[in-house]
């Protein structure tokens, strides 16, 4: 496995290709990805920010990609946002979800906790302030079409809005 990480070490030659890091959604996949990224940083001796040319993410992966592309957050620092403390803040159950009902018309979690954590990291910064190319993927349920936010095509969108749009799932988050 160590040979794999050699492609990320510094070379005297300029690479003829671009390296894109694509991160999946889903909490468990997001955490597993961070474990891999920490190993990559340790083996290569480089921050993930310096190892890739572009960051792409969906849902929880959009959060991770935004943190990495924004200002070079290290994977070890990113891991803290997936601790029990932060997850309890992000995944605060909606008042209506706990009420007895077979049909839930509201999302399971409130958005305030998620937005609060994102605000601690990104404040009111726009996608245009992200230091490396970043793409977040979302889906517009009403228009039944995909939505792509990036710092090069929609720099006026807030980072928080782009991440929230990507992680919005009607059953879980608004």
Model-based region annotation:
Residues 1-22, 141:
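Small-residue-rich anion-binding loops in enzyme active sites
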Residues 1-5, 49, 83, 136, ...:
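Generic intrinsically disordered, low-complexity segments enriched for polar/acidic and small residues
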Residues 127-174:
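Active-site gating loop/helix substructures
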Residues 8-13, 44-49, 119-132:
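Surface-exposed acidic, glycine-flexible loop patches that form ligand/cofactor-binding
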Residues 14-22, 27-118, 148-150, 158-163:
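Patatin-like phospholipase
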């Amino acid at each position: 496995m160590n040979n794999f990480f050699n492609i990320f070490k510094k070379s005297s030659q300029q690479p003829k290709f671009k390296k894109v890091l694509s991160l999946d959604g889903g909490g468990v996949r997001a955490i597993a990805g961070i474990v891999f990224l920490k190993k990559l940083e340790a083996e290569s001796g480089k921050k993930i920010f310096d190892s890739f040319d572009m960051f792409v993410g969906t849902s929880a992966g959009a959060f991770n990609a935004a943190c990495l592309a924004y200002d070079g957050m290290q994977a070890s620092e990113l891991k803290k946002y997936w601790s029990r403390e932060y997850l309890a803040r992000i995944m605060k159950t909606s008042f209506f979800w706990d009420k007895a009902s077979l049909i839930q018309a509201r999302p399971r979690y409130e958005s305030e906790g998620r937005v609060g954590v994102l605000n601690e990291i990104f404040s009111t910064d726009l996608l245009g302030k992200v230091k490396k190319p970043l793409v977040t993927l979302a889906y517009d349920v009403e228009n039944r079409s995909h939505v792509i936010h990036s710092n090069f095509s929609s720099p006026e969108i807030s980072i928080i809005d782009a991440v929230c749009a990507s992680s919005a799932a009607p059953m879980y988050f608004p």
